[in-house]
């Protein structure tokens, strides 16, 4: 008879990863998910581990810290990475997935694990006893948020914006061209809609004059830089978008032989290639304004939008003030947190925090010593930031090489990232032997 038990609230990326890791270590898991009885404003699929903002898990190269984090998770036996590799779609140098297949893959694995029981329905209170992982996500329900507040005190709010999706057969291929930046991947994984200078200026002017969805007065709007609405970026200056999501660098229009003034990139959304999302085009414009303005983009004049952009509230705790490096709550160590509610930002980071919370949740339930990954690994760097950053100005953060400890000695700039990755994977391999 299994005595060790673990309760996990939330079956998103972090909750599912935590459940999988804990169950794999012999701990019985009760995984609570409020869907399909109740949906957040941004979720639509009935399955577990739903991807909301984008279908991209970002770059695969170890030149990017997120690529290193994915490689670490893959080596550690992450369910998230297993699902991602099994359901990937073409995306140049990035790892992108068919989000429907991705959710179905993880749902099947979780529901068929003998030590995991999935309970559907909203959890309004953190259980009063036992080991608990709170992985309720950035869209935590009001009732549960109130319960969390009893343990954490004040928590912060910010908004992410969701990008639109169009059907591939509604894209005018006589105006758009296929190419990946610098020819990465298969070289034609993205559709690109080029804009000349006049078209770009008209587009910016339309964005600045467009009607937006108003935020409620009691909610403070704080945008995370990695998911900022395009109209907010446009307000920063004429060329801000041209140096951001609309940058033309590395993209040559085959009809002109030169780089366009600006480019809107469309990334394949599903395996069949029938849907494409507008890369970096998160927005809080009203639906009519989105359709009007985005159809002025060359190639999208008759675009069929299967999903328009929208805004939703995100909730996260002040992790440096509240959490230990083991993801335990300082004032009540039987409670752990995981996922975006901790202030990690991004799919991969959420899964990574779930991996570590699941590992330590299982150890806590079994009475074993808890562990923290080496600080030189991507996992360790992420943990260190989340739990050690200045609490006064704490904001969500993606993994990046700026969070890693410096290398010993002098290293050429162009070699630094490769050396950081090499050091991380060497340390990770040694750490894995202790698990």
From Swiss-Prot:
TM regions (residue ranges): none
Alphabetically, which GO biological process terms does the record hold? tRNA methylation; tRNA wobble uridine modification
Localization in the cell: Cytoplasm
State any GO CC term: cytosol
Q: Which residues form a coiled coil?
A: none
> What's the superkingdom here?
Bacteria
What reaction is this protein's catalytic activity? uridine(54) in tRNA + (6R)-5,10-methylene-5,6,7,8-tetrahydrofolate + NADH + H(+) = 5-methyluridine(54) in tRNA + (6S)-5,6,7,8-tetrahydrofolate + NAD(+); uridine(54) in tRNA + (6R)-5,10-methylene-5,6,7,8-tetrahydrofolate + NADPH + H(+) = 5-methyluridine(54) in tRNA + (6S)-5,6,7,8-tetrahydrofolate + NADP(+)
Cofactor requirements of the protein: FAD
In the record, the note on similarity to other proteins reads:
Belongs to the MnmG family. TrmFO subfamily.
What is known about what this protein does?
Catalyzes the folate-dependent formation of 5-methyl-uridine at position 54 (M-5-U54) in all tRNAs.
- Provide the protein name: Methylenetetrahydrofolate--tRNA-(uracil-5-)-methyltransferase TrmFO
